[in-house]
Amino acid sequence: MTYLEQLEEVEHYSEAGSFRRYKEVSKDLDYIISTRHPLHVQQHLLNIPNKVKEVAVGETKVSLELEYDDETIGVDFRLVEPEAFYHTLQHFTGSKDHNIRIRQLAKAQNEKVSEYGIEQQDGTLLQFQSEAEIYQHFGRHWIAPAMREDGSEFDRDLNSIITLDDIKGDLHMHTTYSDGAFSIREMIEANIKKGYEYMVITDHSKSLKVAHGLQVERLLRQNEEIKNLNEEYTEIDIYSGTEMDILPDGSLDYEDDILSQLDYVIAAIHQSFNQSEEEIMKRLEHACRNPYVRHIAHPTGRIIERREGYQPNIEQLMQLAEETQTVMEINANPKRLDLNAATVKKYPNIKLTINTDAHHVDHLDFMKYGVATAQKGFVNKDRVINTMTRDAFKNFIN
């Protein structure tokens, strides 16, 4: 994308396809580029620095294999006239079922829709200069790409679905106290740049030695440092917390007299994934019933395409969460996305929080992936606790 931004002949560009729809795994990438100089842009694309192979080269489409993070990824670049850009973008974003519904809406108005525009009965071509105008033409509000899947999105009220702008704070992040790369102060500054109203520092607990988990003395020292920094920064509320391990025997990594001194407690499973479902559920139940535990982080422990996680009984866990008013997390790290969209859609009564689990200031940008996961699950913003205003969250904490 940085390369495309440098090309003067490119007027607009956007990712499309499954990547734009925030699918958990995209096998290849699609980009739509608007230009009045397609042959010039084509030559620039053929000179892209990380090119591995030219798959197909034409005036309106260039298919390449590019190297990224030691992997080879197929990328299709479609070159279109600026007037058709948003129609091509909508068309190639998909999904197939979503576009079938679009064509049905067009047919009902005696029109035909394509990647070039909307053809009228008399053969004239309507071309709009935003996706929103295309949807508006068919009497619909713009639908976020993450929700463009099976077509049912056309039959839902999407007015209250969460958006990235609704997020007021990040409740799960790490610092140099454990396995994070930046200090508390640096994380505060990064959260302020995000425009957040509040944040929680949640370094790992003592048993997670591989992540330099905090012994009690260091945890309390950090707690004091956070409270002092909270006095210093007036533009954001900074809360002390922990991402506390739920140990294999079901006990928690800190005693209640320690937890009571923190503002916000997260519980998580990081070890003994091979336990039985019954054993896993006993651990999660013990955490959910603890009066100081606010939410369960990455509730299945999966890492996409690397490990399945520890497979709790999801139905029992959601019932337990509802009974105990324990919040479940959508971990926004794109390698986790845990809980996933199908689960949050299936259990609409569960309160949620969307967090980045940031170990680096750049990881705060992961929030968009978590929000997209929530959108796929048609999550209304009032289900997500970190959409609360600053004062409302303070009252919730207290």
Please annotate each region the language model reported.
Residues 1-14:
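Helical scaffold of the NTase/Pol beta-like nucleotidyltransferase catalytic core
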Residues 11-16, 51-54:
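A short linear hydrophobic-aromatic micro-motif
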Residues 16-22:
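Short, solvent-exposed loop/turn elements at beta->coil junctions and helix N-caps
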Residues 22-175, 184-195, 212-236, 248-398:
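Charged catalytic cores and adjacent phosphate/nucleic-acid-binding surfaces used
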Residues 175-176, 196-202, 206:
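Ser/Thr-glycine-rich phosphate-binding loops at phosphate-binding pockets of nucleotides
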Residues 191, 205-208:
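Conserved structured catalytic cores and adjacent interaction surfaces
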Residues 199-203, 238-241, 297-298:
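Short beta-strand segments at enzyme active-site cores
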Residues 241-244, 369:
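Active-site catalytic microenvironments in core metabolic enzymes, especially phosphate/sugar-handling
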